[in-house]
């Protein structure tokens, strides 16, 4: 057994894996969609799921069980008596008996079922108050299998208490997931949040509300009253279909319906609610429901045995119910209640479609559940902008987006958005991760483009790091870190400035000493090289002179070329006697012997050394080397002078490096004032402007004949607005394509009502009375009888988007000019101009991707953007075309289901229908090729019955603008502007720093004139960081200016030209714990007033303001810096003491 234990363990593990695989296959999801704001009295939330089929033998043992934490109502869990009504072929028929109307029979028996949707009176009505949830199921069966549909209804408060739990029905597990949508209180339809308000259609004009198609789930409730016919529901159906004379249908009850995913209960019938009348009429037309079968049975076949009657209950002496017996895929619900009995008699009829035609009087039933659709008026929830912030995390950033009314659309080209949602009250929050911070983070949220500057994230990390380093002095840690952590050259300049101020008295002599040592070594190497080279040149000159006067310098014996006369004389004396002229050792008096000895002789350089000693020794103490050696780098005067020069230099670099680069769109920091233009010629501007950008142009126009006469000129172009005259085509629908085969052996094709005949869109082809044996099963009667009915229909209709057709287009900009005291405004179209006596502003043309006759499709809120269709069918639409299925105010428009039927036959086999046309809806085709369509984004949309206006936030459109100002201006009249402007700073929020931004609130007073168009800037003492154009009116005006930039010492003032408010306000320091973005719409402003760039005086003014700001700010920072300066001076004094005998030590 010990040897077999590993095998047993292996088999056990395999069995567990197989069990887990089977469990996973039996897991189904039931999604409950909840609004994310739950208030009292908002009704019920409902959901359903269709489960896989199970053998009919298991139905009687089914039990719906729950492991959820909510309180389940027990009324549906008890056993209930049903009459099981089935059909079968008669057992006494001979083997080859052909099928006929008498070849089958029905049987009735009593069974007990539990958990079906038999909802007692007041259970649904009190569910919200009692905090009880209702779980039940319904059955759609043929002769062998049943397909359950599980329904879950509960008070909407369960969306708060439950996130996920499990239900079980037989061997099937149902994962119940409560998902909060981005809707505050409405249902999610077409990607938008829709609040159905049925009274709007009665009290308001049609253009003030929207109409949506929503699903309706209805459940039969039994309620008996002692007298009257008020609860006899069948009477209402008979009245609706104008059937008179029926007196036997005494069943009493009503349907309670839930609309969409959450709603208050709707009672059917109810005289005071037109929604109830609409549902009642749909029930009368489609008595079994408007949803015909499950999606996986979209292409299936059924065989009709014939009409049957039976006894319900089984103890009846005569038939009380009728229907159509079939085999094949199950269709509608197989449960119902008999209408002819006072007391409810429940029927379970597998394989039989029970009679539901209300135009007959007898043997009718009502289904226990009914599913359909209803069109309702209502309003679409307003959306708000998103707030996004990010924090640095590892190599990337952690970001979070939230909105007060939900996030319906969020995407980013640089981040991974995982759709993990949280809700705090009405706010919806989504967290996501951005893996890279080497580029700015762009997020599209609720139709707005948000940009987070990643350099601000790095600044935040820098602040955190420096704060940790200086944590021993927490009073100055953050203030010092904020000053140091500035991006780019500006930050390095700040750090060098502080290092120079604090440690300059130590760093300057240290760095100077190191540089001097390097220079001295280099000078010495250069001088040494010069000495050797000069000596070699001297020897060469001596050699040449000797050769000229005395002859050859070559020894005749050893053939060695000598360099001096003494060396040649020694060779002549020694070589001839066989002695070495250098070391005087004996050798042979031959050339080879002597040359071999010279190679090893150690005294060969004796004569060169003697010559070198006879020359004057070189003293490298003159010129550069001597100057460097005697440089007094430890002098207090030198160190102090360099320290002051470096401080001034660093302040200039610090101020100059604070300027931002010029941008096409956005603010460029400039000095105060505006540019002056002498009007010697006409002033002409010709440029291209992005559709999402506004443009401000401001100048002082000067009289060339008199420089004192100046006219203020202000031009303001607002963002481009697209005006589209539209035709509302309706709502585009998606649907499931169904192909059904209905075969019966005898009777004409008109004998039966086929399931697809109650669908909104269908076509049918009948193959009646077969003429051969090739299309008949073996039990059919043969040639000349029977029918194969082929049907194609569309169901499971779902509204997916709004559709508008562009009738005409206009592109406009509002143009305003202020020339002296004259102000003119006009909304200018393409190829239109604003013309005054002196100024002409023209919008010459627009580059656009929109054209009249284009069709716009919105798959969600307008702010989410849409798709442009160049071809959209409006009259003759085929299934699969864009716009194939449309829901319009006049009703449903069905497409042409083009294609031909073909009956597939085989000998002794039931025929099957085939369809060779398109089977994919236009919406599904569009989704598969969505990237091939042009898309567009929308900001600030405004829609009415026949018009749609919006701004393009992507700058995909451009306008050609031309501006001409005539030089013939009336300077005498226009230069004298009586308007007086006084400015005061009210408040400020936000932070200084180029990546954070601030909002300055100004109070501007206008006197002496009624209106004046001008620009108000946000400036400190040196520069301006933002501007806004304001049309001032007489009196007090509140102006908001958004700016970015500045430093810790900036006192932001409200300025007009060179006049500023008397006081300024200091913005907060950029803590940058959570970096928020700026709206791209706020940044798409082009401002050009020609103000001069910051020069030398501006730099000193900026540096001085910063120093004063530091002094007036956290005094502990200044104290610490001064202490460090004193310590560095003391250290310098100790390391570099003054030497009074310096001159004596260096006396020559």
Curated annotation (Swiss-Prot):
Stored InterPro entries: Envelope_glycoprot_Hantavirus, Gc_C_bunya, Gn-B_hanta, Hanta_Gc_N, Hanta_Gn-H, ITAM_motif_hantavir-typ
Disulfide cross-links: 34-159, 68-165, 117-136, 141-146, 183-193, 218-257, 386-445, 390-399, 415-434, 462-485, 745-780, 749-787, 761-894, 775-905, 790-913, 816-825, 833-842, 873-877, 979-1009, 1002-1054, 1019-1024, 1055-1060, 1094-1098
Glycosylated residues (UniProt): 142, 357, 409, 937
Cellular component, GO annotation: host cell endoplasmic reticulum membrane; host cell Golgi membrane; host cell mitochondrion; host cell surface; membrane; virion membrane
Gene giving rise to this polypeptide: GP
Residue ranges, annotated region (Fusion loop): 767-787
Name of one Pfam family that matches: Hanta_Gn-B
TM helices/strands, residue ranges: 496-516, 638-658, 1115-1135
Site (Cleavage): 658-659
Lineage, highest ranks first: Viruses, Riboviria, Orthornavirae, Negarnaviricota, Polyploviricotina
Molecular function per GO: zinc ion binding
Family: Belongs to the hantavirus envelope glycoprotein family.
Start-end of CCHC-type zinc fingers: 555-575, 580-601
Protein name: Envelopment polyprotein
Every ITAM domain range: 621-644
Gene Ontology biological process terms, A to Z: fusion of virus membrane with host endosome membrane; signal transduction; symbiont entry into host cell; symbiont-mediated suppression of host innate immune response; symbiont-mediated suppression of host TRAF-mediated signal transduction; virion attachment to host cell
The UniProt record lists the keyword Membrane: yes
